[in-house]
Amino acid sequence: MVNSKGKITDSDPGSSHLLLNGLADKAGKNQDTEPENSLCSQYEEKVRPCIDLIDSLRALGVEQDLALPAIAVIGDQSSGKSSVLEALSGVALPRGSGIVTRCPLVLKLKKLLNKDEWRGKVSYQDFEMEISDPSEVEVEINKAQNAIAGEGQGISHELISLEVSSPHVPDLTLIDLPGITRVAVGNQPADIGHQTKKLIKKYILKQETINLVVVPCNVDIATTEALSMAQEVDPDGDRTIGILTKPDLVDRGTESKVVDVAQNLVCHLKKGYMIVKCRGQQDIQDQVTLTEALQKERDFFEDHPHFRVLLEEGRATVPCLADRLTSELITHICKTLPLLEKQIKENYEKITEELQKYGSDVPEEEHEKMFFLIEKINAFNHDITSLTEGEEFVGEDECRLFTKIRNEFHKWSLVIEKRFQQGYKAICKQIERFENRYRGRELPGFVNYKTFEIIIKQQIKELEEPAVYMLHTITDMVQAAFTDISEANFAEFFNLYRTTKSKIEDIKFELEKEAEKSIRLHFQMEQIVYCQDQVYQCALQRVREESDKEKDKKINSMCSKEVSSVNISLSDIFEHLLAYRQEATNRISSHIPLIIQYFILQVYGQKLQKDMLLLLHDKDTHNWLLKERSDTRDKRKLLKERLARLAQARRRLAKFPG
């Protein structure tokens, strides 16, 4: 707190960091006049729950599934990033040359509103350690980095969590990222620059992240890599805050340029800039405490002729920065909570659906395994029944198997129609050829039955191979559909899936052969020219009635040109051909699909279901059949863990007072 003399005291529980977000006025202005207990009550109700909620979700590992609101701290090497974090947290963090931050550090600062003593905790991997003295933090962070990234200069994406609880810290959670390096030095990997940028981009790309860019005042802001990276992912500066450091190192005469940058007049960011003066190396050597450094910082800005205006505007000092960041984080969390809740709900439903595909764990007891296998096979058989009866569930952009088969049957009817729809001229030539070859002692005008019979047999024979081709096409479709059902039900059980697939193939070859035999038998029978008298007479009558209507226009005129008085029987033969073809078409277009449906859908499905039930008889194979893929177990375990995380996250969001 700043006392009436402008001095910062250690004893005040409010610390040097002033609350914002409706709980206090901006730093540098007078404190609000509400009673302290009212302020604490509002603080407990609004500020801490927001940050605790996100911290708890991050601790659950929810960030593995979706992005959480966060403030990421980035900066070039030697930008003063560590000094800023030290000033905010009140603890010494690793310092030195080269890459000091080698793992992302989640810095959780928790303000204690009473006189409780300082306490800290470092967590990483499966390790957790309580810290009772702030001086131990730097050592423990270095140990953690060495354990994760190895001793040296390598970096890692794995998080280290540092929790600091004290009356003298703001309520804030920051993610400290490695400093940006351009050239590998010492034993650093050759691509250390690429590795570092890749790690930083992983965080700053997320729309849920506020980017805190640390830039020294004594460099050209346009040349800093950190700001360039932030602008690349946030070109409008909507979620970027600039932090200017080392104002005491600015060359004389360039102070006004720094003020212009801080006042957002040079490189515009919607969230603007803050400026701070942290402990330098000389201060550390002189053992200047962080509290003393805060007082020195305030004195520096109050006494500086150029930078004093920034203090008056609330843009300067670490306490102002702390309040600003707390306010930004709370606002950002409240803004993103509805979307976060929606994303968690959607992910929960998606993972639940995915987990159902992997089924439940295989029981350990033998009798339970028997029932488990029965359930799996019954579910498979039920899906086969639904498929063969045209009642299976399909997605919005898919169609049922029976619909696909019906389309093939429709194509078959078009093939028949096309083969039988020869033009009159072509038929006349064909009839004339057969008349010249087979006509006996009949007088002109008498129909030669042999000619009629040969033409009909030949036309029907030409349909046999297309019918067999249709059989093979539909058989492949049914086999693929059965295999898909097998995969959907048994994919996690390699042996059961392989056994089922083998049965599907074996039954397919067997029934396809029988169906082809029946189809060829049908076409052999079609070589017997036969039709019920009454049926044929009706068909012939219809053809002749149609013929009479167009006799003057087409048939007679064409016949008079195509045939002489010697071949006056052509029109009669043509009419008989049309009449018989109508009835043959009805038989073939219906009977061939019936054969295919019977063998390739009905019998195929029934035989497969029976063979699957027979697997239950051999108890010795149950363990073998239910042997899971190792990746299936791992995937199911992973999905269950994700589901548990998201379920806890949903419960915590539901309890959040909002």
UniProtKB/Swiss-Prot annotation:
Region annotation G4 motif: where it falls in the sequence: 245-248
Residues the record lists as N-acetylmethionine modifications: M1
GO molecular function, one term: microtubule binding
Region Bundle signaling element (BSE), residue ranges: 339-364
Residue ranges of domain GED in the record: 570-658
Binding positions for GTP per the UniProt entry: 75-82, 176-180, 245-248
Region annotated Stalk, chain positions: 365-628
Family named by the database record: Belongs to the TRAFAC class dynamin-like GTPase superfamily. Dynamin/Fzo/YdjA family.
Subunit note: Homooligomer. Oligomerizes into multimeric filamentous or ring-like structures by virtue of its stalk domain. Oligomerization is critical for GTPase activity, protein stability, and recognition of viral target structures. Interacts with TRPC1, TRPC3, TRPC4, TRPC5, TRPC6 and TRPC7. Interacts with HSPA5. Interacts with TUBB/TUBB5. Interacts with DDX39A and DDX39B.
Domain description: The C-terminal GTPase effector domain (GED) is involved in oligomerization and viral target recognition.
Entry function: Interferon-induced dynamin-like GTPase with antiviral activity.
The name this protein goes by in its record: Interferon-induced GTP-binding protein Mx1
Organism encoding this protein: Otaria byronia (South American sea lion)
